[in-house]
Amino acid sequence: MIASIKKISAFIVVLGFVLINQAIGQQKFVFEKPAMGSPFTISIYANDSVKAAQAASLAFHCADSLNEIFSDYIDSSELNRLNATSGGNRYARVSESLFDILKYSIEAARLSDGAYDISMGPVVKLWRKARKEKRLPDPDSLKVAMQKVGYRFIHLNDKERSVWLEKKGMLLDLGGLGKGYVAQATLNVIQSRGFNSSMVNAGGKIAIGEAPPGRKGWRIGITIPEEKEALLPRLLLLKNTSVATSGDIYQHLDINGKRYSHIIDPKTGIGMTRQRNVTVIAKDATISDWLATACSVLPEKKSLKLIKKFPGAALLISELQNGKLIRKSTPNFESYFEN
């Protein structure tokens, strides 16, 4: 009996030694290609470069497939085909992926009291043109576009997996949530192949798996605004979570000396004019993506209240007010910085 126990103990020790050495022997493989209008980067720790490349290839295929469904830039996308049915008197059946992201989006709009709203497509279209022409949208055109906006006019039928866009001319736009959704979906594909220590960066919307071998987490660089528009680089240490940053320091339009953010207030149809940078950490990249967008629109107190609805989520807001930089954060955000 004692001899058997010794043999079992020896086996466990040897097995543990082998597993540890396998983990430590893993290398980091990085794969990158353009997707959804942004650099799309996949990082995988693995022992086998060929298998890692195969997993990355499957993940990129997943991203491309979802983009063909969600993109409003692709005329033949499923989203645009759905938009074309707006104002009709019937529900349109949609794919499982599109229905799933629409459910996410409507829940996001409800929880944020409309600060995130996927029905802003007609207004977003005007602002895209305005950015190209470096002028504000025509007020009359903006008024007409705003009449087509409202997430409450999007109706879902769970049983039939179908959608009715009540108002004619409605255009759904999944910006502010789509990249996070795709990042999370592609990470799930990679992890399903056995590569748990992996990370996906979809144009700054980052889905993060288990920590790299022998480390406490992935080192994620973010930039925090400082006084006089300087940027302070900081490192976060993260695992099994996601992070997204949003704000007008990255995309904005300057007209007549006034700065307009690429993020539009759904209540007014006007690009945000305050200078704010928002970083959100949450368990799912879809959630961190739309929360970062919503918290760029909401007042600070409402942003902090919204984050509390998601256990473990963290928020950092940096805003320039009257020439002075103000920072607000949830108590747990500081713990994610690398010491």
Task: Indicate where each model-derived feature is located.
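Hydrophobic h-region of N-terminal signal peptides that target proteins for export
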Residues: 14-22
